[in-house]
Each structure stands twice: as C-alpha cells, then as structure tokens.
C-alpha cells in the first residue's frame, strides 16, 4: 500500500472525524491496526462546514501543526471541493461529513438528502476528476488502473 501523502478528511470537526485526526497524528492509539503507522507524517486537510456537530475546540492541539489545514466548506459546494483537491494534491479521502441526528431528519429531511447523498456525490466526482486520466485510467502511485479492471 502506498504511503499516505495528502489526505482529505470531511467532517473532521465532528466526533469521529476529530478522533481520527488525533489518531493519524499519534495522539490516540485506538485503531492502530487500521493504517499501521499511528504517527502519520503526511498532510491533513480537514473540511467541515461547522454545523451543530462540528467543534474546532476538539482540534486545538493540532491546529498549529505545519501538516494540518482546516477549510470551512460545505461538501455540497462543488467549486470549493474541486479547489481543495487542486490546491492540495489530495491522494486519499476519508469521508465522515454527514447529517446524522435522526430527530433533525424528521423536521428537515431535505438537508439530510442534500448532505448525505448529494454531498457524497460531489466528493466522488471531485476524486474522479482529480485522479482519472484522459484515457480512462486512474492514477495510484506508480501504478495505473483501467476503470474496467476495478
């Protein structure tokens, strides 16, 4: 497996996202078998729109790291997400951003569909655009995969 260089984490100010960021930077030992290296040396770009579940206070201990960047953006904003991919040479995405409180989904289901479905589609399309070559192959380190093989 290729070493992670520039990882985009969506929803990184939420409970799961901020704990994952702490894990990557070696500030937590839970789940060390996931990536094998709890002292991640690549760059983390944390994208969160800071709704009711996002709290940057949970990331005070990483906010001044040279390899950490926070971007306040909504995952449904195609232009913002495309810009983040282009400016940061993203090679991996961990997508935690979501509307998750069931009681809120009853009052306003449209927001849930927009974020959880359309926002995920924006992320997938941005990754595809960033990683797909003109001939239909996808870049992965020094290897190239044809979309028909995947």
Describe the residue ranges of each PLM region.
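N-terminal Rossmann-like NAD(P)+-binding domain of SDR-like oxidoreductases, especially those catalyzing
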Residues: 1-150
């Amino acid at each position: 497996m290729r070493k992670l260089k520039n990882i985009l984490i969506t929803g990184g100010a939420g409970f799961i996202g901020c704990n994952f960021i702490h894990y990557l930077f070696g500030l937590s030992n839970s789940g060390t078998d996931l990536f094998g290296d709890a002292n991640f040396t690549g760059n983390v770009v944390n994208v969160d729109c800071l709704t009711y579940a996002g709290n940057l206070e949970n990331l005070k201990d990483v906010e001044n790291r040279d390899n950490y960047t926070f971007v306040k953006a909504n995952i449904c904003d195609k232009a913002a997400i495309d810009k983040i991919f282009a400016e940061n040479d993203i090679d991996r995405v961990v997508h935690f951003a979501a509307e998750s409180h069931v009681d809120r989904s009853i009052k306003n289901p449209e927001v849930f569909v927009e974020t959880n479905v359309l926002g995920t589609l924006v992320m997938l399309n941005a990754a595809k655009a960033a990683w797909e070559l003109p001939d239909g192959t996808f870049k992965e380190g020094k290897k190239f995969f044809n979309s028909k093989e995947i």
